[in-house]
Amino acid sequence: MAGEFSRTSRIGDQLQKELASLIQFEVKDPRLGLVTVNEVRVAKDLGYADIYYTVLGKDDQPEVLAENQAALDSAKGFLRRRLAQEVKLRVMPHLRFHYDQSVVNGSRMSALIDEAIRDDETKNGNEDE
């Protein structure tokens, strides 16, 4: 059972929890919206951590996304220092923030599926008459 999860994935999960808390309660940047940390991928050598995030309700506004990216980039040093205090690692990875497109892509796919279902229903309804 212990071999199922790699060390880097366990570290990524821990960093995700800590980052979510730190961003919500300790980062005091007015540019920062309601950020959700979706995933943290840590390199095998712990040299860097890729943090994938979304912003609640602002997926379609590029200027808001750019402001959030700038706020997170400016808070990297603070977040890394606080993570080093909370998570006991010999080396704390460098943080790289990326906006997570998967939520936007998922909602777009869901809309396309709903549209296809409606089209099928209207076609089937016309054929029955």
Swiss-Prot record:
Where is it localised? Cytoplasm
User: Which InterPro entries did the record assign?
Assistant: KH_dom-like_a/b, RbfA, RbfA_dom_sf, Ribosome-bd_factorA_CS
Q: Which UniProt keywords apply?
A: Cytoplasm, Ribosome biogenesis
Instruction: Please list the GO terms describing molecular function.
Output: ribosomal small subunit binding
Q: Does the keyword Cytoplasm apply?
A: yes
Major location (coarse): cytoplasm
**GO terms of biological process kind:** maturation of SSU-rRNA
SUPFAM superfamilies with a match to the protein in the record: Ribosome-binding factor A, RbfA (SSF89919)
Q: Which domain of life is it from?
A: Bacteria
* Gene Ontology annotations for the cellular component aspect, listed alphabetically: cytosol
Q: Which family does it belong to?
A: Belongs to the RbfA family.
| Summary of the function given for this chain in its UniProt record | One of several proteins that assist in the late maturation steps of the functional core of the 30S ribosomal subunit. Associates with free 30S ribosomal subunits (but not with 30S subunits that are part of 70S ribosomes or polysomes). Required for efficient processing of 16S rRNA. May interact with the 5'-terminal helix region of 16S rRNA.
* HAMAP family membership: RbfA
Q: Which NCBIfam families match?
A: rbfA
The UniProt subunit note reads as follows: Monomer. Binds 30S ribosomal subunits, but not 50S ribosomal subunits or 70S ribosomes.
- The name of this protein is Ribosome-binding factor A
Q: What organism is this sequence from?
A: Marinomonas sp. (strain MWYL1)
